[in-house]
Amino acid sequence: MNANLPPSAISELHGPRLLLRAWRDSDREAFAEMCADPQVMEFFPSVLDRAQSDALVDRVQAHFAERGYGPWALELPGEAAFIGFTGLFDVTMDVHFAPTVEIGWRLAPAYWGRGLAREAAETALDFAFERLRLPEVVAFTTPPNRRSWGLMERLGMRRDPAEDFDHPLLAADHPMRRHILYRVDAARWAER
């Protein structure tokens, strides 16, 4: 894996409709609104307050500075300056499939159902396999999150129920502790 790409080499990716770009300070307000929205955060342990949301943006920016990739801010040119994020995260927690790279996404509800999460994820996966030369990318979510795992399947990711896991950062009795794991490798991605 080439994790030493200069951030300038990947500060922007272009999809047919979307711009995946570096985060701006002006994104923080819209992101905080998303993270405080119970609909957006339905399958996360809790909504985030402004300080927690800003701290997440800070971690994203630090990840980019350190690794040369991360979750990009999503812009829909001509329509919206910020609609959410999609991108790549290092998985370092204590799970059987780590260390690896995860793809994740979060969009404002006004942009759901338009194929934008899929477009952004395809753009990020192209980057993961073509530029970073990753052997595999994973994604995971809670079983009730059909929208998310449905997208994983539409992306060609595959699930093996034997690999499902309990999220180590959630309490043993937390209702969202159980997670399902999807994978796609470079060869499968190239075949699509």
Swiss-Prot record:
InterPro entries: Acyl_CoA_acyltransferase, GNAT_dom, N-acetyltransferase. Residues 18-187 form the N-acetyltransferase domain. Keywords: Acyltransferase, Transferase. The keyword Acyltransferase applies. It comes from the Bacteria. CoA binds at residues 105-107, 113, 145, 150-152. The keyword GTP-binding does not apply. Pfam families: Acetyltransf_3 (PF13302). GO terms for molecular function: acyltransferase activity, transferring groups other than amino-acyl groups. Its EC number is 2.3.1.-. Catalyzes the transfer of an acetyl group from acetyl coenzyme A (AcCoA) to an acceptor substrate and releases both CoA and the acetylated product. It prefers the peptide Asp-Phe methyl ester (or aspartame) and the peptide antibiotics polymyxin B and colistin. Other substrates like dopamine, serotonin, puromycin, chloramphenicol, D-glucosamine, glycine and N-alpha-acetyl-L-glutamine are used and displayed lower activity. PANTHER family: GNAT FAMILY, PUTATIVE (AFU_ORTHOLOGUE AFUA_3G00765)-RELATED-RELATED, N-ACETYLTRANSFERASE DOMAIN-CONTAINING PROTEIN. This is Acetyltransferase PA3944. It comes from Pseudomonas aeruginosa (strain ATCC 15692 / DSM 22644 / CIP 104116 / JCM 14847 / LMG 12228 / 1C / PRS 101 / PAO1).
